[in-house]
């Protein structure tokens, strides 16, 4: 993961280390600072693919900073993915991020046209915060740099949003979605979803320079990721925390890992180890309050801090081991619960923040987007993944949040959606004869 800070608010050089503390952890390879047209552009680089390329990108008085990974850029024309962004803006205009395939947060200043573009991908997998006060802009990967600069009112850019403003007057010119989904439920097989998922794993793992790791439970989501990586003959390492897992399923998956030649660590997360993992969070992760709620009840978890989530401690533990083992690319299963099951099945909630008990209606327009598509547990657990993995200098990638994977699920008929818990993944695991525990929701 990379990170950035942009502002035209003045600060002292000796304040920079405090301002950049949490964000610098995400990009430990190179920190670059440039002053352009009265603005400070700071970028922290985590180099994962392509040549080591510092930012910002500049061309014809247009300046761009970027955090994430693009999977469809012209590798013959550009030595890194971010170098393609200004050319795409010049070709397609302020809504150019609609043409991107990847996970990203982008800020682009066109000083010629007085235009500022802020955009994340459809699910805001990479965070982006901004503030506009007294004629000054503050834009950053995290909230804390803006607060350290003295900004009082900081806003997280909404998921699936392109925000176009005037640089000088701060006037909002336009907001548009990055991805628009078709809610017609017309496909009566899982074939196209399976193909999209296979392609999503491939684009996030093939031809990478750094090593890959996953957290492997006995559940559906990590099982599907593991299965596809094994099918692709990918080199990767799996870390499993035993305890609440289905040990029979986990043992079978461990056997498949062994015969593939990939490493699989079975771990006991003892209280002393939990304390160490939690202390890392306290020291290196900024505060983030969860936004989890249900649209069908008054249940919420607004009181819960990312720092106190048990899953945060588990991810911190696994991330510490991945960093020790020099594995930098984390393939996350985030999003499957929110999109393919709504934390329930057949109208019965598995967790109280479920919105409709996983019973998909004949007309998706009546519920889409339900809160956990873009907000609620999606926003909260993505923050957990990004903040924790980022604090160890690791990059998280999200195959279940690929727009094609999501669209193919939405296109399946209600009968297919409701045929089994997490129907698309259930079918995938069955077709591949991969060990699974039917209808179990497993994880930290």
What are these regions (language model features)?
Residues 271, 438-444:
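Short linear loop/turn motifs
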Residues 55-57, 100, 340-343, 394, ...:
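Short clusters of hydrophobic/aromatic residues that line enzyme substrate/ligand-binding pockets
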Residues 32-33, 267, 418, 437-439:
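Short, hydrophobic secondary-structure boundary micro-motifs
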Residues 1-279:
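Cysteine-centered catalytic environments shared across enzyme families
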